Amino acid sequence: MCARSTTLLATVLALATASAAYAQISVRDLPEIARGRAERLRPKQIAALEPFWADLSLDYEENKEFLDRRIGDASRLGDSVVPMLLEKLRPTQSTTDADNLASNCRRVLQRLDPGSFVDALAELARGDHDTAKREAILLLGYAEDPQSVAVLSSLIGTANSWDRVQIVRSLRRLRAARAATDVVPLLGTDNRELRQEVLAYLAAAQADQVAPTVIQALSTEGDDRLLPKYIDYFAACVRRDAAATDALLPLLNRDRIDWQDTLHLIQALSQVSPERHEPTMRKLRDLIDSNDTSSLAVSAAVSLRALGDKNGVTRLKRTLDDKLRRRKREAALYEQRARLLFAIGDFADAADDYEKIIDYAEGAAMTRRAYLGLLKSEARRRKIQNVVKQMKASGMSPAEFERLAAEDAPFREAMGHDRVQSFLRQLRRSRAPK
């Protein structure tokens, strides 16, 4: 039924846009004509997909590389096979092969613009066939259509635990903020996986309208493994909010989150906290005092500066300068000072420190970090000659430069310069197989 309605819609649209050939056809006749055309096309669809059924009945995880090729081949048959693939989402037999076939047909459909058959997916998702419902929920996450969000939201209240996780994942893929008020109550469930998915969705959708509920959920969250997800949400969605800041500050005690998450929290507070929020500034000053010249101290000083207190940066830089006067070959100290200088926009001095790190580096990982920092610093200074010089010296591959460009806008701009492109062409030729 769903498959045929999809074909019917496509046929009606084609007929409606045709000119001379169909000028004499009555609108009343269009559904019947569409049904007739669908019946005539069905044998061709069956024949086109027949070579694929056995392969698509294999377990995906055990045959991933092979099935990815076959799924790609099947998708290249185009929209004409959509009706047959939709039928396979609703197996008539409860067998492993039938379930595998449904899942792999869904993977083919993912590549065929699910938004063009969202009506059929909505019907399957609202139906009572468990396999079809599951596969349709997953496909709706790839259907860029307002109806997808409406259908997924409507299912939350009655869905089982597994389906709820998939519904929230699909909403996250769609970045559909308007579903947030339906989703956020799920933070009150005892399902940790579901709560984790809810937080990931809210951050991806930048759903700031539900921040008060998330603040309340954080105050009662008993699973420390989820705390980084709360930090991610507030970092992505909340700005200059005292209530959110008050909920986050206790995490700086570091008895519930690790060093890396503490670093992320310090960075997030530079935007989440209101400016000159005294409890935040007091906590950050304490971190500078207790962590000497570590990365935590650097991030705390930079966040303090963003909140209106420049003294933290001044004090920390003075401490680093004093230590480097006594320990002039200590690469780790240069690295912390370079990070501080880069963060406050002093790119020339940061570049000097990154070069010192390269001279005194204590390992390949530190050297690589220094080259990345140096390239980003020179790109911000628009020193193209220096950018090319350091690209040559770094020994990095074209692919590594492309990854850096994808992450860093100023370096991406520098990559477009003629001199940089000329160097990259030479580098690719030198690394090409002989």
Task: Please give the residue ranges for each predicted region.
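Bacterial N-terminal signal peptides that target proteins for export
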Residues: M1-L9
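Bacterial N-terminal signal peptides
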Residues: A10-T17
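Boundary at the C-terminal end of the N-terminal hydrophobic targeting segment
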Residues: A20-A23
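Amphipathic alpha-helical scaffolding segments comprising HEAT/armadillo-like alpha-solenoid repeats
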Residues: V27, R42-D55, L77-T92, P114-R126, ...
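Structural detector for internal amphipathic alpha-helices that build alpha-solenoid repeat scaffolds
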Residues: E32-R40, E62-L77, E87, D97-P114, ...
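Alpha-helical junction/boundary sensor with strong preference for TPR arrays
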Residues: T92, D128, A159, D190, ...
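Pro/Ala/Gly-rich low-complexity, hydrophilic intrinsically disordered segments
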Residues: G308, T314-L320, L424-K434
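Alpha-helical protein-protein interaction modules
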Residues: R326-Q421, Q426-L427, R431
